[in-house]
Amino acid sequence: MITSKVKAAILGESTLKSAEINVETFKGIVQLSGFISSQTAANKAVELARAVKGVTSVKNDMRIK
């Protein structure tokens, strides 16, 4: 449930629509991986994930391409 909410938040952000971000969740910990266009975009994705109810922490494994 948290995974789909995080994905929806990321897809709803116009600056991240084309990003290739994978979302995995385990016990409230969200792991973001994949490729992103800039550090600013990565920070935005982490910020959006943290804002989702039920998320206790976010691990950023995204790579800038």
Role assignments for model-derived ranges:
Residues M1-K65:
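N-terminal targeting leaders
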